[in-house]
Amino acid sequence: MEGGAMMLLEVKNVTKKFGDKVVLKNISFTLEEGESLGILGKSGAGKSVLLHMLRGMDGYEPTEGQIIYHVSYCEKCGYVDVPSKAGTPCKKCGNELKKIEVDFWNDKKYTYNLKRKIAIMLQRTFALYGEKTVLENILEALHQAGYEGKEAIDMALKLIKMVKLEHRITHIARDLSGGEKQRVVLARQIAKEPFIFLADEPTGTLDPQTAKLVHSALKELVIKNKISLILTSHWPEVIAELTEKAIWLDKGEIIMEGTSEEVVNKFMETVKEFKKPETEVEIKEDIIKLENVSKHYCSVERGVIKAVDNVTLNIREREIFGLVGTSGAGKTTLAKIIAGVLPPSKGKYWFRVGDEWVDMTKPGPMGRGRAKRYIGILFQEYALYPHRTILENLTEAIGLELPDEFARMKAVYTLVSVGFSEEEAEEILDKYPHELSVGERHRCALAQVLIKEPRVVILDEPTGTMDPITRNTVAESIHKSRIELEQTYIIVSHDMDFVLNVCDRAGLMRNGKLIKVGKPEEIVALLTEEEKQEMFGQK
C-alpha cells in the first residue's frame, strides 16, 4: 500500500473448533484500509468459516485468538467509518469521529454498529426480498443506510447502472438468474456504505460469462472506490484478477502468503492436469435413441417457447457424451427428457434395458418407470436431505438398504471417487450437510447419484463449485467408472474445457435445436465468438 495507509483489520492467532474438529488453526494476517486480500484454497479448506467469523455470524466466534477492527466511530449516533476519517465530522450527525480499536467478538458495545457496516456476499445464498423488484430491493438497503426521497432514487439508479441491470429494474427478484441475483446483492451491500466488503466465492456457481459481469461490478463498486475487500475463491484466476495480496489456506492453516500472483503460481504447481486415458474403451451399441423430440412451453409474455426443437440423437453404451451450449440453449430441458423427468411434447424416445427397448413417452411401470431406475441425474439445483447425515443421504434416504458395515464401506469408496481422501470421507459420513462447504456438498450429491450404480449418469453443470484439483479428480472418476461399472455419461455443461478433456463426443445446442454432433474438437470449431466467451475460460 502507499505510505500512510492505515491498519483496518488484524486477525490474531485465531483457531476455530466445531466440537473436536479444528477447522481453522492459528490464523494471523492484517488488512490495511483500501487493500484487497484473496483467500485461496480447495473446497473445505476453511475459507467460508473465516469469512463468517469476520462478519460476526452466530456460532462462528473464535475458539482462541482475536479479530480486531480499527475504525473511526461516532459516540453520539454510532456511525462507523474507515480509520482515516477520524477527526472529521460524522456524516449522520456532525459530531467528531474518534479512532477506536474494537475486539470484535468481545467488545459488545460496538458489535451491532460494526456488523451493519460489514458487507458480505455468499455463494448460493441470495439475501433478497423475493417478491420485491430490483429497484425496491436496492431502495430498501438505501433507506436503512439513511438515504431518503430523490437522493435515494438517484443513488439506486446509479447502483443499478453500475451492476448493469437497467433492463431488469421492474423484475421481481425471485425471477432473476443466479448471476443477476448476485449483482442485486452486490448493489444492496454497497448501499450500506461498508468499511469492508467480504465476498465468499461470489461467482463459484456461475458460468464464465456471467462471472465476468459480477467481477466487473465488483471492480467498479468495491475496488475503484477503495473499499477494503476480502475475497475467497477456489478459482486461482479470480484471486489473481481481483486482489493484490493473497493467502493460501489448506486444511484450516495458512501455508503461504504473498502477492496474489506469487500465491496463485505456487497453488497451480499442485494442480495436475487430467489427461484422457490412453486405453481404448469399447463403446457398445446404442442405449438411447431420440427421434424428432420437441418440448414446447406456453408463456403469456413470449407465446410458444421451443425449449427443445425437433432433436434426433443416439447415445451409445459406455460413451461419455457432452451436451453443450450457452445458458438457455435447451441443454437442461433435453437432459430432463432423457432422464425421464419430463415427457416430450412430441417425438419418439427409446431407452434400452438389457435387450429390450422401453418407450419413454409412455408413463407407468412398463413405460418410463421401468427405465428410470437405471438413470441417475445430478441437477444444478441439487439438494441433500438437511436433517440426515451424509451416510444416511448416501444410503437409506435414497432407498439403498445395505448392512451397516457394507453401507459405510461403499459410501467411503464412492466419496473417494469424487475427490475426498479416505480419511476425509470417513470423517464426513457422520456430519450433516450444513457442516460442509458448498463444494463438499456438491460432491456428496454427486456421490449420491453414483452410489446407486446407474447405467446412465446425467450430470448437469458438474464443475460449477469445484476447484481445479477436484475437477481433475472427478474427470478421472468418470473415466474410471465407465470402465469398471460400464456406465454411460451425459455431461450437460457450458465448461468447454471440461468437455474437451472428458467427453468422447459432444452435441452443440442453440435455441433448442441440436446443431451438430461430433468430436469435442469439431464442436469447438463451430462456436461463435459469443459462445466461446461463455463456454471457455473458467471464472
Swiss-Prot record:
The keyword Mitochondrion does not apply. This is Uncharacterized ABC transporter ATP-binding protein MJ1242. Belongs to the ABC transporter superfamily. The lineage of its organism: Archaea, Methanobacteriati, Methanobacteriota, Methanomada group, Methanococci. Keywords: ATP-binding, Nucleotide-binding, Repeat, Transport. InterPro entries: AAA+_ATPase, ABC_transporter-like_ATP-bd, ABC_transporter-like_CS, Me_Coenz_M_Rdtase_A2, P-loop_NTPase. It holds the Pfam family ABC_tran. SMART domains: AAA. GO terms for biological process: organic phosphonate catabolic process. ATP 1 binds at G41, K42, S43, G44, A45, G46, K47, S48. It comes from Methanocaldococcus jannaschii (strain ATCC 43067 / DSM 2661 / JAL-1 / JCM 10045 / NBRC 100440). Residues 9-276, 288-536 form the ABC transporter domain. GO terms for molecular function: ATP binding; ATP hydrolysis activity. ATP 2 binds at G325, T326, S327, G328, A329, G330, K331, T332.
